[in-house]
């Protein structure tokens, strides 16, 4: 109360001290005095001109904001680099999918930066990140930053159209993604860079100079990132934040937010939220660690994620924080609350933690205001950090400061203020929140204020506290917060207007708080005239009865909004009202609308347009529990919730789904997942899913039974202990437990003991150079002790034949044999009862592992290595249920499982499983063949959806081929897809094959058939443990159903596992592949992001290859209909089952291969089908000869001794040879993720700059020595390694230098740069010693390989030349495939056609027709290289082929290889005195050796500069030109018709025999095509070979000099005739025949 004493001109302020502080009272009094004086001095001034700021306020503000905010003028990457230098080995990232140290993160981000710089990324160029939460997010952000670009992380939960709008707004054409999200990324950008997956930390480091991106001009005012917020115009706004802004904010936040160097900051926030940037980038400049949970853990089990990652610091919105109990976060020290206003109850809930309140709008960096949470006032925000200053101004006029304590608009000053909105045309307008000019009051209060200071009007209403702290008081506009996300109602309204305007519907948006959750309510009205009226003058607001027309409009609007806006911005309900009220100011009267909505029952809000259906009332316990949970979370009466009630149509959203999950354990429903709620939103469906888990628990497997007491699963424990001690040869005290084997294990042991399967499957892991081997062993020991399955052995009871598992103590079994390597399949341990089932060896950096098939399935072995990788990095080994829990569950549920399978198969047709038709046991062989196709698929909600489509497609094939509607085939069940959480976490062989019965009902629609299949499979998943053998014992029909001939396997395309401690891709043993030999036909579908590889694995002795090809073609055809967009309109009967690809076949070959020898048969190594009209049945037979010896350490090539191709080779033989070598190369290829990591080290210039070491073969030959010369003389190449045949290094070097001197270029100055390795191309590992081979294969020593070496011999057989010419090429190609950043150039020979347009099969026919083994070896060697290049992804084209014609000497020296065919032919004609005039108009490709060698080296250094896989060396001459050049040299020759010339050649050959120049090629004389005398043959050379006129002139000069050289050395006769002895002195190159 203010008391004025007019006589004394004194005013007294009376106040309640319990509500107003003395400081507040003083400021009120000072303000009153200032206002009163102002009015008294000028009573006629306008109200807005009255001064309200007192001197007390001015003095206090001067004190608080005396200094300008501190700006850090530094780029982010410089601060990060400092941290890397200080603590390179400290953990930078700990994530669900792996971890990185600071050094490793620096390394990988630098590789990515180099790649981005090559793509043109630089300052202020934006790159988007399209990836779900994983450890590669920091790599992507840092890589972009180091390239001097700016990033924007996309929230993939948002609609694709909104993501496209963001990319368009940023003008971003490049996105970085992971394999999981690459399909989405390709829809957003023209250039996609894929990183991540299971790719490892690369230990093989490149040179430090190459490890960092090239320096470019970076500046602190360059853009760092952009984050998008809601915009009132209908489009999101992109805030552009600069380096100096974020760095200033982050460094100033570290101390106030209590971030310590050893903290682990939880990366929780969505990428649409600017806090997500803070969570990633701030830890990396403070020395802390980013803790990244999986998206699944983040939504479903945040408590477990925090515990597993050891997070100590987290930032959550209050809405999320109140879902959890703080006691469930023991590792958490600090909790920051932000994004929305915290309630005092939130602060009280988390008072056991250090709770910090944070604030800042996205336009001012993530955080700039913070303070310890105030339990008494949830509006408390904290104080400004040193990077910014806070001012309170008049909401209507920012040029007017308000008194301390007054509520006004919060204005932020400092470097933290963003540059602007991306491409904002209104940036400089007065309405822009970014203030362009410094306010006068700031200059008055602070004399040193710079003119360039940045200010931002937040739109938030706030007030000062007495200590400069800030209190949030609301918004001055209609902007709202939904789940912490800023939302402009205007954006929603704008989009709704554009959708509904054609329907003449008005729209308005309000937000209601309903039971602690913000809901957007949309009002629509047909009476758009109401918008123009005054709400005070129109009638009562009321809900209009819904019409079909309005409902359709709303449904359409909702659908469109979901495509263009995030789900949280789509209205929860639409209310159709009689009109939209407006206020006196002409704006929508939202206050009245809000009051009207709040007056309605909540059920009414949800029922009006949602068509709420309740259905039957719940009956089961699970149904009643879910009804109660729905009611509690959604605030709806239970009697309004029935079996048909849909969680989301009742008003639920993603946040309330998390609340539902948090409530589930209290209701005893612990096995419902976040995805389950979205997948089964109807109460009845979610209850059914929950009941499956409950059934499992009742049967003895769940949380209450996760611990089984030792020996409790056997009856006579003591006698079994004695038996086990004897069979295992161990002490009784070392036996920890004994329990029965599962039916699956018993079956595996039975087959293993009988020798029908390989019992132990083995693999090897090469340790990284920096890895501590003791630490690796210690980690394995810890895993061995923690995982009882690894310590399990198997014994057999002699009396009953029962198999038991014995868990023993002790340490892991290490094989101490230093010589043998048991990790090879052929030398693996035999199946032994009582022996160790896991064996390991660690020798010379190689960890070899052998594990029995009875102990694992595919999931288990991958998870084991993931767990060990985490433990190696310091994470605790996960606690998993023991396998005896599963054994107990399987034993207790035998009755229920038997009942299920009896009911399922009791009336099955006795012939339902007989496709393909069974064969007798005697005729069954173990000869496996493979065929493969690739089909385009789009992975839908989950792989289960696709699996149902595959199963229906296969059922339709069986029906079409047997005409039986009752179909049974086998399916491989993981045992985990629909299991409880405990089952999913168990290590052990849970996966098994069970029969699936499908009844074809033609009247059923495809959608219904798929839904039924999926339901059947989910129900069946609970009982797969019974096993095929026991199911078959349930009756005659069940036994017949278990005689399955076909098994269908559907599994994801998982990348090769790679770890932080081992360097090579681990091709893990695959259980499903191993089981394929037990069935006549296995169809394996490997599902990728946008395609599926479908393999048929079959017994080719009894199932013809052509029939399997037809089956695959038919499968593709049927699947295309079921998977297609029109499938929902199809009935099962309308599916076309005809194999349409046969319709266009003019005739079908009846010739079938008589044998398919123990091989791997692929239709094509790229998994694409051959032409359906192929008419080469012999090719099928020849291709079946492919045998591939699989070694997990190195893809090798082996041939059955009985499989040597007959000579001369046919075209089918050549194709078979190509397939064999190509398969070896294909298996050497690493995973797509590791390909990417290698690619990151490459740029378009990386092969033309920097340090290079080049490896050259054939360096002592005619062409090879010139290649060596250009390598040694090229300044870009620092080191050259030449492989030369020789018994010692000295001999090899001597041969190399001798060749160089013969070519007239050697100088001793070349010695320092040259290293010569003795070897032999015909030998394994090229005949190199172990050290040299390791250097060649280590991925770091060699940057490029030039493979020129070959054995050139016209008389030897193919088999004699194969090892040198083909085998060596295959070995080098495997190295190149395994290391995609290795440049590989193969020097090949030319054929008539354009080499890049040449088709393989016609070429094979042509090459076979020549009957020349040398040419055939070159063709076979070249073809796998061509196929490999075709398989490589875009940008991975480091493999090139140089295709040569005839090579002559250079223009200066003319030194040639005198044994080349061209010179022998010319010598023959000179000697005869005549030449073939019939070939004069024909053209031959010819090049000089210098130009040729130079082109080869240039290609090796810069393969990207050669756009096609094959580079032909252009240039050539007409034969008439050649003869003119020869005669111009003084050689007298007469032109003769072909027949006369041939007669002369035959006569001379007969007379001179071995002294004749063509004697060694006499078998080719009759082949006119080889002598180029076939009319028209020469003209068949494609234009790709022909050079320009300058090339031709240079070529003529080189040709003359070569002829002169041959005359000088005596190969061609001189002026007095040719040397009679035919000897050529040592100046020319020769071949040994």
Curated annotation (Swiss-Prot):
Positions of region (Reductase (R) domain): 1256-1483
Domain Carrier: 622-691
GO molecular function per UniProt: ligase activity; phosphopantetheine binding; transferase activity
InterPro entries, sorted: ACP-like_sf (IPR036736), AMP-bd_C_sf (IPR045851), AMP-dep_synth/lig_dom (IPR000873), ANL_N_sf (IPR042099), CAT-like_dom_sf (IPR023213), Condensatn (IPR001242), Far_NAD-bd (IPR013120), NAD(P)-bd_dom_sf (IPR036291)
Residue ranges of the region described as Adenylation (A) domain: 80-483
UniProt remark on domains: NRP synthetases are composed of discrete domains (adenylation (A), thiolation (T) or peptidyl carrier protein (PCP) and condensation (C) domains) which when grouped together are referred to as a single module. Each module is responsible for the recognition (via the A domain) and incorporation of a single amino acid into the growing peptide product. Thus, an NRP synthetase is generally composed of one or more modules and can terminate in a thioesterase domain (TE) or reductase domain (R) that releases the newly synthesized peptide from the enzyme.
NCBIfam families in the record: Thioester-redct
Protein name per UniProt: D-lysergyl-peptide-synthetase subunit 3
């Amino acid at each position: 109360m203010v008391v004025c004493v007019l006589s004394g001109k004194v005013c007294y302020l009376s106040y309640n001290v319990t509500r107003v502080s003395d400081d507040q009272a003083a400021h009120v009094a000072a303000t009153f005095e200032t206002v009163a004086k102002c009015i008294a001095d000028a009573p006629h001034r306008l109200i807005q001109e009255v001064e309200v700021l007192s001197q007390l306020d001015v003095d206090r503000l001067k004190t608080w904001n005396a200094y300008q905010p501190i700006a850090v003028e530094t780029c982010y990457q410089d601060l990060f680099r400092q941290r890397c230098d200080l603590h390179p080995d400290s953990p930078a990232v700990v994530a669900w999918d792996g971890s990185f140290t600071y050094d490793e993160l620096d390394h990988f981000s630098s590789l990515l930066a180099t790649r981005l710089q090559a793509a043109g990324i630089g300052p202020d160029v934006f790159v988007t990140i399209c990836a779900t939460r994983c450890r590669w997010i920091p790599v992507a952000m840092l890589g972009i930053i180091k390239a001097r670009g700016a990033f924007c992380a996309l929230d993939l939960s948002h609609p694709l159209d909104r993501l496209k709008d963001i990319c368009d707004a940023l003008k971003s054409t490049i996105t970085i993604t992971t394999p999981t999200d690459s399909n989405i990324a390709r829809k957003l950008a023209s250039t996609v860079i894929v990183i991540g997956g299971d790719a490892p930390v690369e230990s093989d480091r490149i040179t430090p100079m190459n490890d960092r991106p090239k320096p470019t001009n970076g500046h602190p005012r360059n853009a760092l990132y952009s984050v998008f917020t809601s915009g009132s115009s209908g489009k999101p706004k992109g805030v552009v934040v600069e380096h100096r802004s974020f760095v200033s904010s982050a460094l100033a936040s570290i101390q106030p937010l209590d971030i310590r160097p050893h903290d682990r900051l939880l990366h929780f926030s969505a990428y649409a939220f600017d806090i997500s940037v803070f969570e990633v980038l701030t830890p990396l400049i403070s020395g802390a660690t980013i803790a990244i949970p999986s998206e699944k853990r983040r939504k479903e089990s945040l408590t477990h994620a925090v515990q597993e990652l050891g997070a100590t610091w987290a930032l959550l919105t209050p809405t999320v924080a109140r879902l959890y109990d703080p006691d469930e976060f023991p590792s958490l020290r600090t909790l920051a609350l932000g994004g929305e206003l915290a309630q005092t109850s939130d602060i009280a809930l988390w008072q056991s933690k250090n709770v910090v309140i944070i604030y800042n709008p996205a336009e001012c960096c993530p955080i700039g205001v913070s303070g310890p949470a105030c339990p008494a006032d949830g509006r408390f925000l904290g104080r400004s950090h040193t990077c910014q200053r806070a001012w309170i101004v008049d909401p209507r006029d920012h040029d007017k400061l308000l008194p301390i304590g007054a509520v006004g608009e919060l204005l932020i000053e400092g470097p933290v203020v963003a540059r602007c909105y991306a491409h904002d045309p209104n940036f400089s307008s007065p309405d822009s929140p970014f203030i362009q000019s410094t306010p006068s009051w700031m200059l008055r209060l602070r004399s040193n204020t710079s003119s360039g200071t940045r200010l931002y009007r937040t739109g938030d209403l706030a007030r000062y506290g007495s200590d400069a702290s800030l209190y949030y008081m609301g918004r001055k506009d209609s902007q709202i917060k939904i789940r912490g996300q800023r939302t402009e109602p205007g954006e929603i309204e704008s989009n709704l207007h554009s959708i509904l305007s054609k329907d003449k519907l008005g729209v308005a948006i309000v937000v209601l708080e309903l039971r602690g959750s913000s809901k957007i309510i949309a009002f629509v009205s047909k009476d758009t005239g109401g918008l123009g009226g005054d709400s005070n003058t129109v009638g009562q607001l009321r809900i209009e009865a819904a019409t079909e027309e309005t409902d359709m409009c709303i449904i359409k609007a909702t659908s469109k909004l979901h495509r263009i806006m995030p789900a949280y911005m789509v209205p929860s309900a639409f209310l159709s009202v009689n009109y939209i009220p407006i206020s006196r100011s002409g704006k929508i009267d939202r206050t009245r609308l809000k009051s009207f909505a709040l007056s309605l029952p909540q059920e009414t809000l949800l029922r009006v347009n949602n068509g709420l259906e309740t259905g039957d009332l719940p009956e089961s316990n699970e149904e009643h529990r879910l009804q109660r949970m729905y009611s509690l979370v959604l605030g709806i009466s239970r009697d309004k919730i029935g079996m048909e009630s849909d969680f989301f149509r009742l008003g639920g959203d993603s946040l309330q789904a998390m609340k539902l999950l948090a409530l589930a354990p209290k209701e005893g429903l612990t096995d419902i997942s976040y995805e389950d709620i979205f997948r089964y939103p109807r109460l009845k469906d979610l209850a059914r899913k929950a009941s499956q888990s409950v059934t499992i628990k009742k049967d003895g497997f769940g949380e209450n039974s996760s611990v089984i007491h030792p020996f409790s699963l056997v009856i006579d424990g003591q006698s079994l202990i004695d038996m086990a001690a004897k069979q295992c040869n161990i002490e009784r005290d070392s036996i920890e437990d004994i329990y029965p084997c599962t039916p699956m294990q018993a079956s595996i042991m039975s087959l293993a003991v009988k020798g029908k399967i390989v019992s132990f499957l083995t693999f090897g892991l090469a340790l990284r150079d920096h890895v501590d081997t003791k630490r690796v062993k210690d980690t394995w020991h810890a895993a061995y002790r923690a995982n009882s399955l690894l310590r399990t052995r198997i014994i057999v009871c002699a009396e009953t034949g029962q198999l038991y598992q014995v868990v023993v103590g002790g340490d892991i079994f290490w094989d101490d044999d230093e010589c043998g390597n048991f990790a090879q399949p052929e030398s693996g341990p035999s199946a032994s009862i009582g022996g160790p089932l896991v064996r390991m060896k660690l020798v010379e950096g190689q960890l070899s592992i052998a594990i029995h098939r009875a102990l694992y399935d595919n999931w288990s072995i991958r998870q084991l290595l993931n767990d060990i990788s985490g433990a190696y990095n310091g994470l605790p080994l996960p606690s998993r249920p023991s396998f005896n829990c599963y054994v107990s569950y399987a034993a207790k549920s035998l009755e229920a499982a038997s009942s299920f399978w009896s009911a399922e198969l009791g009336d099955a047709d006795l012939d339902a499983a007989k496709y393909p038709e069974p064969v007798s046991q005697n005729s069954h062989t173990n000869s496996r063949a493979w065929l493969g196709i690739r089909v385009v698929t789009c992975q839908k909600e989950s792989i289960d959806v696709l699996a149902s489509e595959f199963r229906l497609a296969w059922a339709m094939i069986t029906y079409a081929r047997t005409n039986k509607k009752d179909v049974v085939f086998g399916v491989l069940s993981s045992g985990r897809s629909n299991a409880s959480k405990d089952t999913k976490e168990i290590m052990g062989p849970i996966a098994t094959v069970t029969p699936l019965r499908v009844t074809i009902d033609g009247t059923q629609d495809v959608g219904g058939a798929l839904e039924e299949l999926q339901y059947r499979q989910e129900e069946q998943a609970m009982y797969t443990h019974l096993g095929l053998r026991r199911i078959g014992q349930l009756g005659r029909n069940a036994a017949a159903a278990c005689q399955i001939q076909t098994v269908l396997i559907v599994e994801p395309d998982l990348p090769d596992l790679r770890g932080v401690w081992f360097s090579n891709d681990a091709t893990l043993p695959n259980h499903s592949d191993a089981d394929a030999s037990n069935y006549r036909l296995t169809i394996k579908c490997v599902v990728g992001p946008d395609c599926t590889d479908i393999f048929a694995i079959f017994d080719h002795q009894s199932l013809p290859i052509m029939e399997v090809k037809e089956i695959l073609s038919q499968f593709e055809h049927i699947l295309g209909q079921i998977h297609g967009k029109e499938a929902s309109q199809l009935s099962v009967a309308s599916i076309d089952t005809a194999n349409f690809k046969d319709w266009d076949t003019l005739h079908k070959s009846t010739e079938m291969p008589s044998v398919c020898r123990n091989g791997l048969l692929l239709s094509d190594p790229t998994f694409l089908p051959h032409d359906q009209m192929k008419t080469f049945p012999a090719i099928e037979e020849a291709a079946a000869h492919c045998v591939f010896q699989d070694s997990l350490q190195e893809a090798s090539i082996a041939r059955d001794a009985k499989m040597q191709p007959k000579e001369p080779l046919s075209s089918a033989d050549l194709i078979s040879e190509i397939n064999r070598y190509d398969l070896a190369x294909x298996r050497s290829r690493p995973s797509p993720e590791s390909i990417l990591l290698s690619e990151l080290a490459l740029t378009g210039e990386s092969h033309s700059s920097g340090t290079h070491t080049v490896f050259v073969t054939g360096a002592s030959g005619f062409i090879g020595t010139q290649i060596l010369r250009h390598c040694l003389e090229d300044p870009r190449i620092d080191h050259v390694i030449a492989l030369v045949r020789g018994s010692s290094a000295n001999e090899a070097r001597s041969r190399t230098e001798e060749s160089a001197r013969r070519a007239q270029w050697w100088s001793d100055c070349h010695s320092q740069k040259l290293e010569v390795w003795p070897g032999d191309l015909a030998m394994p590992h090229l005949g190199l010693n172990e050290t040299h081979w390791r250097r060649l294969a280590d991925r770091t020593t060699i940057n490029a390989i030039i493979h020129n070496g070959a054995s050139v011999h016209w008389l030897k057989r193919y088999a004699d030349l194969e090892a040198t010419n083909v085998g060596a090429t295959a070995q080098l190609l495997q190295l190149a495939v395994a290391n995609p950043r290795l440049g590989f150039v193969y020097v090949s020979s030319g054929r008539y056609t354009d080499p890049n347009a040449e088709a393989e099969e016609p070429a094979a026919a042509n090459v076979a027709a020549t009957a020349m083994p040398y040419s055939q070896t070159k063709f076979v060697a070249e073809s796998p290289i061509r196929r490999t290049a075709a398989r490589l992804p875009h940008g991975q084209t480091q493999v090139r082929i140089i295709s040569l014609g005839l090579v002559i000497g250079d223009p200066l020296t003319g030194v040639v290889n005198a044994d080349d065919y061209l010179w022998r032919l010319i010598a023959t004609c000179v000697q005869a005195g005549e030449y073939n005039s019939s070939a004069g108009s024909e053209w031959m490709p010819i090049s000089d050796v210098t130009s040729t060698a130079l082109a080869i080296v240039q290609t090796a250094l810069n393969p990207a500069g050669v756009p096609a896989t094959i580079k032909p060396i252009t240039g050539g001459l007409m034969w008439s030109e050649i003869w003119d050049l020869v005669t111009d040299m003084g050689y007298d020759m007469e032109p003769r018709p072909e027949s006369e010339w041939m007669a002369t050649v035959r006569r001379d050959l007969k007379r001179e025999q071995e002294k004749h120049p063509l004697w060694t090629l006499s078998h080719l004389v009759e082949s006119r095509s080889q002598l180029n005398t076939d009319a028209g043959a020469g003209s068949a050379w494609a234009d790709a070979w022909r050079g320009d006129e300058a090339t031709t002139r240079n070529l003529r000069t080189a040709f003359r000099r070569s002829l002169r050289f041959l005359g000088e050395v005596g190969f061609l006769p001189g002026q007095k005739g040719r040397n009679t002895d035919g000897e050529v002195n040592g100046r020319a190159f020769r071949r040994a025949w």
